[in-house]
Amino acid sequence: MRDIGSIIESARERQGLSRAELAAALNVSAQTVAKWENDTALPNAENLVALIKMLNIDFSGPAGKEPPSYNSMGSIREIFKIGRGPSSSHTIGPERACLRFRSLYPDADSYRVVLYGSLAKTGKGHGSDTVIKKTLSPAETLVEFDPITPTPHPNTMDMQAFRGGELLGSVRVLSIGGGNVLFGDEVCSSPVVYPHSSFSEISRYCAEKDIALWQYVRENEDSELWDYLLDVWRHMKSAVQRGLRDEGILPGGLSVHKKAKQLFEATHIDESAETRENRLICAYAFAVSEQNASGETIVTSPTCGSAGVLPAVLYYEQQKHGYTDEQILRAIATAGIIGNIIKTNASISGAECGCQAEIGSACAMAAAALGALFELNTDKIEYAAEIALEHHLGLTCDPVCGLVQIPCIERNAVAAMRAINSVSLASLLWNTRKISFDNIVETMKETGHDLLPIYRETAEGGMAKNYNPIKK
């Protein structure tokens, strides 16, 4: 077992934090952090929990015992959230945080919200300040952007409530992706629903009981889930259909034209079946992604920025093969398990792990859903999801001008096609595979933490750096 000190030190350095910065975030002295890293002292239980959460580290605790596991899965409702775009972590997350904070201080007549990290750097482009002010209205709200002060989590916001100029209360909130938020010292954002948290555990259980993944969902979730998933599917279809009708230019200043309708109607007399399939799937993905970029209602799957992948695949398959809504819901439930495993054991946030955590996760979910529609066995579904995620490893999150447009919209279309290819490959080669889905989730997490911050939704590197037509 590695020493606790070396694990803390390497995790801190991976996040680009000095000892003093980490100490300030934990409200301890830099000397205390130094003692932890030199193994001359151990963090107490409260600090241990904070370190796990802030630095995304995994280590054995004092006396050689494993610390409590926080990798317990909540409901797949947390994967599929119905809301307005363009960003789950920058609009849906702050909106949910504001609603919750307002309920804590209903007598407040004014608020102050400070955004840090990625929230500060791309919040203007995502409209974070607009949604915060709108949600907390009619109270007067001051929103400040602080891209300089370091915080252990890239999507951090401080909220303060006032009445008559006097402070009523404050809280630090983390927007951890997919519209999920953590308040204060919370470690888990939702109640535990599933008894397992890895694909290997779930697969073993399903094999023992001879059930499919969607049946595993039905066994553990409440009976109202299926009504919720039907609502999810209706909103997904609505986003596709609206997007196929819409024309014009997306907001934000990049002058990006909506292309879904053009793709959908661009038929050719000599178009092959394969070309038509690709064109339609891309049109459906563009449709949802353009609705998201316009701030319209979509469903996170698992995020706003990757919301076009799963609906594109499912909508195409239902239109082509006539799958019933019940079959589609089973596929969505299967996709939800995949997204939940990734969210629990790694991240679905571009600010934490780059675009691989968003588009890569969405592609894996879509591949698993398609495998469920085709009634593939659990091993083949696992392999399809693994292929889909593996070949997005290292993908950077570098939105031009901080908008969820370039390269985000095209990536949804490419990932939708890749999901279908992943299923085709998995159905033929599943018994020759070497890498498990759990392996690739762990690898994605490590890869994401190794990415420089400029490639994690800060709009400071990659395409965001080299192409900026509206740069002042």
For each predicted feature, which ranges?
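Short alpha-helical DNA-recognition segment
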Residues: G16-K35
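DNA major-groove recognition helix of helix-turn-helix/homeodomain DNA-binding modules
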Residues: N44-G61
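Accessory "access/gating" subregions that flank catalytic or transport cores
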Residues: K237-G354, G462-K472
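Functionally critical mobile loop/hinge segments
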Residues: L370-K472
